[in-house]
């Protein structure tokens, strides 16, 4: 059986040095990159380890493949909100697509603007690994069982993550219609060349996502200890919390979150640790970060196309493109508490401007003067606490919600008056704390979508702040707006006519 290889455009083009346009419609190209059948390519656990390496590499991408967590997942998740904006006076055009929202047809969504290609590469590679691991045909299946089972479980977690991300980007929020609308195509095994799957419903996608996560967690094969760059049991559970929150399943989200908080070795960064701990070389770095993309050298980075380079001030000591800054509204919100240590995770523009405020996000700080070597955080314990607080509130336990939120607040500000009680805690207060904590981590728009909030970047010239002039549809929008969902790249529709397009603009 040939392996599903949804490497389409950029992967094929990089390998074959041919034009991008010639590679656009190969959604179900079945030949593996080396042209070898799975049965021949993966003989033992060492071969499986190589596939595992390729699986994690697909999550990261490279300088030509940035349409997942290499860059675009963060840009999509934050640039569509109100806390982050494009720096239009000096940015290099890497983060403006979802800021201006000027796209009109599926032709506008390409490998550089649409989160589609690389998540399916992740799924394809996960399928390949899982099939081999569970085939029973590996020559060292007995003696290497623990290792094989671990890799199998990791692949299921990453397959779930990729399908989850695709579903929440291209499908309506589950809470809108309980998942009855269209999600994305599901592939849980290598496909034959004649197979062209249609879009499953959002509910069916979540069923597959939850099954993968449950199977991986219940396998007892995932380690509890931290290995930088790889998922473990607690990272899988943190992703599970994110899934339950997106579905509005508060009791489930709270139960898993409390398990992580009580039983894992991860702890919140303290105020004295917070700023320095973002550096991967800091002793406290792994205290709170549960899963991150690991950058080891210039052969496995995203170079100047990665998210860290977009966040770095173009005129700073460790320069980047400077495409992304926080908005004035966000700055107002954060600086309203001068004692909040999160003020210091932002850097002022070296060239001045912005009322001399700090605007550049420094959550991926330079390593030896170069931001390209920074690791990229994907799952943190802070998010688990914030989700637990929100879930507890939604489940009716305001006392527990207040205690959980205060765990965050007390570790971020020395101003005790900012703490909450069961009598004054509100959902809005939880949401504000979430925005302050997770800015730049690609979460804001997904929170907007799942909660049915409205994004208001500005209303008129008087509150425009540092924004460029935006169209009305880019100034204020919600999940019912016509551009709430992106269009599926036209090349994918052409390659697989069974994929139904999202409503046009």
Q: What does each of the following model-derived ranges do?
A:
Residues 38-39, 66-87, 166, 171-180, ...:
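Short, surface-exposed recognition loops and adjoining beta-strand edges that mediate ligand/DNA contacts
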Residues 1-22:
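Sec-dependent bacterial lipoprotein signal peptides
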Residues 45, 52, 60-61, 204, ...:
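Extended ligand-binding clefts on enzyme/binding-domain cores
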Residues 92-170, 218-222, 371-376, 395, ...:
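Conserved, well-structured interaction surfaces
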Residues 23-78, 311, 315, 321, ...:
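Membrane-proximal, proline-rich intrinsically disordered regions
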């Amino acid at each position: 059986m040939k392996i599903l290889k949804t490497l389409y455009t950029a992967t094929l083009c990089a390998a074959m040095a041919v034009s991008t346009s010639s590679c656009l419609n190969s959604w179900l190209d079945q030949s593996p990159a080396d042209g070898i059948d799975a049965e021949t390519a993966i003989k033992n656990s060492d071969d499986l380890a190589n596939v595992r390496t390729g699986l994690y590499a697909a999550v990261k991408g490279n300088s030509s493949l940035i349409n997942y967590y290499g860059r675009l997942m963060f840009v999509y998740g934050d640039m569509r909100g109100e806390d982050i904006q494009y720096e239009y006076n000096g940015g290099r055009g890497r983060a403006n697509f979802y800021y201006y929202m000027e796209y009109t047809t599926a032709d506008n969504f390409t490998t550089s603007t649409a989160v589609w290609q690389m998540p399916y590469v992740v799924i394809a590679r996960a399928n390949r690994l899982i099939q081999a691991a569970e085939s029973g045909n590996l020559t060292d299946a007995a003696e290497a069982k623990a290792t094989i089972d671990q890799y199998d479980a990791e692949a299921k977690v990453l397959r779930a993550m990729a399908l989850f991300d695709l579903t929440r980007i291209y499908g309506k929020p589950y809470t809108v219609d309980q998942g009855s609308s269209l999600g994305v195509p599901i592939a849980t095994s290598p496909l034959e060349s004649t197979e062209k799957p249609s879009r499953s419903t959002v509910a069916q996608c979540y069923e597959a996502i939850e099954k993968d996560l449950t199977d991986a967690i219940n396998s007892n094969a995932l380690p509890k200890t931290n290995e930088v760059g790889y998922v473990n049991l607690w990272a899988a559970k943190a992703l599970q919390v994110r899934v339950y929150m997106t579905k509005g399943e508060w009791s489930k989200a709270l139960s898993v979150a409390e398990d992580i908080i009580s039983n894992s070795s991860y702890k919140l960064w303290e105020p004295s640790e917070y700023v320095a701990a973002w550096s991967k070389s800091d002793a406290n770095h792994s205290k709170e970060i549960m899963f991150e993309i690991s950058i080891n050298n210039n052969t496995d980075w995203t170079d100047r196309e990665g998210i860290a380079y977009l966040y770095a001030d173009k005129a700073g000591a460790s320069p980047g493109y400077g495409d992304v800054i926080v908005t004035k509204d966000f700055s107002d919100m954060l600086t309203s508490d001068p004692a909040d240590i999160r003020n210091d995770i932002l850097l002022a523009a070296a060239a001045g401007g912005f009322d001399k405020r700090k605007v550049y996000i420094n959550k991926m700080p330079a390593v030896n003067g170069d931001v390209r070597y920074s690791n990229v955080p994907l799952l943190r314990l802070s998010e688990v606490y914030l989700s637990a607080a929100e879930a507890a509130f939604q489940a009716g336990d305001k006392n527990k919600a207040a205690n959980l939120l205060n765990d965050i607040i007390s570790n971020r500000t020395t101003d005790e008056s900012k703490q909450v009680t069961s009598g004054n805690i509100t959902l809005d207060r939880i949401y504000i704390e979430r925005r302050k904590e997770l800015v730049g981590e690609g979460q804001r728009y997904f929170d907007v979508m799942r909660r049915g909030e409205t994004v208001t970047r500005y209303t008129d010239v008087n509150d425009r702040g540092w924004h460029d002039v935006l169209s009305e549809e880019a100034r204020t929008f919600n999940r019912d707006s016509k551009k709430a969902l992106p269009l599926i790249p036209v090349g994918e529709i052409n390659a697989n006519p069974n994929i139904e397009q999202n409503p046009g603009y």
